[in-house]
């Protein structure tokens, strides 16, 4: 499936550990690659990555910025905030012991769970992490299907009980893996980066 690469320079600039193909697939599903996509409500999702008012406010508070709803129509701002949020979700998931919550772009379950956190909430309060903890306590594998199956029992938000959202999240993962470059550009993840840093520091000390 060939998608436009028009916004790839922005995706590369802000990708962090995220594959460009993933950001491309998400933008396609969110806005059809239309940076002008919006609605009348200031709190509604807007722009290329469909940044919500909640996500915009959270980013402003964390980074000392003052982006307005109209700023979300700037594709660079949209990608910057979107990639930042996705990176935070992946980092939050890394606290879990569940294998499918660990950053692994070759694992469709991780990708679907990441999209679920983006699309339906990721926190311990009522999002994916809450359901993941519930499943882990009961010895149930943390999978995308199981998160939706047990969301109500875990007391999660209604978004994680919506089959249409679940299907949409799957569609993002499917589109990601349909990209010929899906293996390219994914970050090494936290642990490998720490290991590389340690090795580099050791080599520096030995050479002194």
Where are the model-predicted features located?
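Non-catalytic cell-wall polysaccharide-engagement segments
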Residues: 1-16, 54-201, 206
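Secreted/periplasmic proteins that engage bacterial cell-wall peptidoglycan
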Residues: 17-46, 50-63
């Amino acid at each position: 499936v060939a998608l436009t690469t028009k916004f790839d320079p922005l995706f590369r600039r802000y990708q962090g550990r995220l594959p460009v193909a993933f950001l491309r697939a998400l933008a396609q599903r969110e806005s059809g690659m239309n940076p002008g996509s919006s609605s009348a409500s200031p709190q509604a999702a807007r722009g290329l990555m469909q940044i919500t008012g909640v996500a915009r406010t959270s980013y402003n508070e964390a980074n000392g910025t003052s982006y307005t709803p109209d700023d979300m129509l700037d594709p660079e701002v949209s990608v910057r905030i979107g990639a930042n949020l996705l990176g935070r979700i992946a980092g939050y998931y890394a606290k879990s012991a569940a294998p499918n919550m660990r950053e692994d772009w070759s694992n469709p379950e991780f990708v679907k769970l990441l999209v679920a956190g983006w699309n339906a909430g990721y926190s311990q309060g009522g999002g994916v992490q809450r359901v993941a903890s519930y499943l882990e306590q009961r010895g149930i594998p943390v999978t995308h299907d199981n998160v939706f199956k047990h969301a109500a029992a875990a007391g999660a938000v209604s978004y994680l009980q919506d089959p249409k959202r679940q299907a949409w999240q799957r569609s993002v993962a499917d589109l990601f893996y349909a990209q010929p470059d899906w293996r390219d550009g994914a970050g090494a993840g936290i642990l490998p980066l720490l290991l590389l840093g340690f090795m580099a520091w050791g080599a520096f000390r030995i050479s002194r």
